[in-house]
Amino acid sequence: MSLWSGMFGDESSKFIKNTEAIVAKINALEADISALADTDFPKKTLEFKDRLSKSENKSETLEDILPEAFALVREAAKRNLGERHYDVQLVGGLALHSGKISEMKTGEGKTLVATLPAYLNALGADGVHIITVNDYLARRDAVMMGQIYNFLGLTVGVINSQNVSYLYDATHQEEDKERDQVGEFKIVYDFLKPTTRKAAYDADITYGTNHEYGFDYLRDNLVTSLDDLVQRGHNFAIVDEVDSILIDEARTPLIISSAAGDSEDFYVKFYQIAKQLKRDTDYEVDEKLKAISLTDAGITKAEKLLGVENIYTEKGIKYVHHLETAVKAQAVFERDRDYVVKDGEVVIVDPFTGRLQPGRRWSEGIHQAIEAKEGVKIEKETRSAGSITFQNYFRFYKKLSGMTGTAATSAEEFLKVYGLDVIVIPTNRPVVRTDHTDLIFQTEKGKFQAIAKKVKELNMEGTPVLIGTISIEKNELLSVYLKQEGVQHVILNAKNHEKEGEIIAQAGRRSAVTIATNMAGRGIDIKLGGNPIVQDEYEFVKTAGGLFVLGTERHEARRIDNQLRGRSGRQGDQGATQFYVSLEDDLMRVFGSEKIKTMMGRFGIPEDMPIENRFINRTLESAQAKIEGFHFDARKNTLEYDDVMNHQRKIVYERRQKMLRADKEEIEALLQSIISGKINLDPSTGEEASKIIEEKRKKLGDSAFLETVRRIVLYATDVLWMEHLEAMDYLRSSVNLRAYGQREPIVEYKKDGLAMFKEMEEALKEQVFSLIGTITEPSKTENSPRLAGQDEPQQTLVVSHTEPKEFSGVSAKAVAKSGMKEVGRNDPCPCGAINPATGEVYKYKKCGLINAPQHRKSLIN
């Protein structure tokens, strides 16, 4: 026990000790369960479901069912996959069921572990969501594990991007021995039947990516009919690669948007100007914060090129944002590191995984500025119609759990943000991998030369080598060095997940050399000798030392380095790992010490000769710890602000859902509250409002009128919420400046945000009444009434992924973005729209046409 405590920490050792009795119960049931006929398994599932449906205390009943349910899943896996859950995998499953994070090393069978709690929690008929990092893994896991669930009588759905959804097709029959051998990396699509999004969510267990779950939630809060809702609540989630999803992507909000913005000529013009500005003279770059600041000389030069006397006046302020964005695109964002150009489009590269992220776009005009820089088609800027961070989305679940190979280093954050304990699960077999100390070189060139020589040596011995790089650019550069040494190799640039899976699965073959971005092929086991295993090849590679993992650069997060190391030494196999780093690497260059460079220069060490030095290793670790702390603070800061928005978001979305489901009485109550509000202000105005409403009701008929009011409320809610999101975004950009006046930015954000939210609620009733006044009778070709002067609102939804604004500029950016003059919220609206109840021009904050094109045009300088 003391050994476990020392190895896995008190919390983990306590949990493991407490599960011993349950694991013993599951094992004791094995003989009885193995005696069951295949047809008995779905019957058992129906029996469990029946017990739960009749239970007054479902949680207790679930715990009573647990040992038998886990034993059933274990036997189903044996019969369908030829795999039996180890005892440590049962412990991992118990941790997930308890709403904790299971840290399980690579190769310990996390995908199989998830079947245990997924089956148990799906019995309650509220659904289980299993979250993966990409579409490929969602499909792969559904096909492989679908055999188990189907055997037990459960249905399985898959949600993928581009609104593609599947159900596991139990009717497809074939000899599936090959599927069990290659299913870890190759998907047999015959087992996936295309279906609707709703049907995929209605399945007992649904596989999908974190982005799709989040976007579907946002889309569900934009629908105008109950029939269009797809999600059915947030019951239990198992997050695979939980550190990647809940930590690495935590600062990146999901945004669903509609198109808006400046013409592409604007972006091209500012790109031409940015090209003529010189670094350190006209602008400065902060590499740690990935930010730029214009110098006085740069501003003067830009003003001259623009032909503007002063860009910080009311007429010129709109140029500031475009200028800063163009310079940032030029100086901070690098092709083949931050993005690639593919098929005439700028595609973002995930900084943690190296994977391409098609469909996602940077906001604030950054993406458009990069498109101008690369000479591809410039898409329009977007306006946010809804947004949420992963931090707040995943906190919707009644029970949340996760699994990964590397969670312990972030245990504090998991506990503070999500209330999740990390349980370190022992490996089934001892890890015998050798982790060598880092080799440090003076230059990147010297480092790559040394790597090429080392790989050649290992290659001649028959040792398979997996080389991890941090970017596509470094992948291709290292490939040149290996070609010079005559080493045959495969490059993985994370451009095709499925192909990537097939290649990485063979990285353990004799003499195989694979260069991959650090996270490529995550979720795929690398088996010595290849996959499927050939015994002679396995024995040869094992004798040659197993898989050698060579890291070419330290990542900002220690977890990513540990994940790369974890590719070697699975299930007690031989293996070795080592990092080759140089003083020119980004981590050392930006955060490292000048003393190291001076020391290596003083001793005259050749550039391709390494040194092993404790001081330098400590400097590396210190730099990583600094960055991790910096990112933790940034994520905490993001969450503090999003918590304010989350409270408002819940109110708006709950009210919207209520209106979707509202009956006649509830809609009548809303109309009455509008009339009452007007009467309180002015009895004559209230009477006029009542007349207008009754007049429209008579024209349309009671039923059609109330349905039109429902649509108006939904539309007005969406329009005002979009405006409110924009206003809150601008508020966020400006509150940091209030710190100079000894005021706490987050307190100011909460206070002003609440005032703006109350104004929005007040404006909603005004706008609903205003739009009711514009209702006209339907034409002969139309089935429903329409609003005068307006078409049915259309929305082009653009999936967007935006970086948060941690270090914001001045509040004038709000003006600069749209090129609008500032108008007081209580001023008459410049669009001139007349309030039919009063005969006067609407106040700006209450204007019923606030999002109409004529409204926006009238505000342009």
Cite the ranges covered by each PLM segment.
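Core structural elements
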Residues: 66-74, 96, 206, 294-296, ...
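Long, non-coiled-coil amphipathic alpha-helical linker/lever segments
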Residues: 160, 421-424, 612, 617-628, ...
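Conserved P-loop NTPase motor core
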Residues: 1-604, 654
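Acidic/negatively charged segments and metal-coordination signatures
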Residues: 626, 651, 655-861
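Non-transmembrane, amphipathic alpha-helical segments
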Residues: 11-14, 61, 608-611, 615, ...
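C-terminal helicase module of SF1/SF2 nucleic-acid helicases/translocases
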Residues: 277, 539-694, 704-705, 725
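Heptad-repeat coiled-coil/leucine-zipper interface motif in alpha-helices
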Residues: 22, 29, 36, 44, ...
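Short amphipathic alpha-helical segments with heptad-repeat character
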Residues: 20, 27, 459, 628, ...
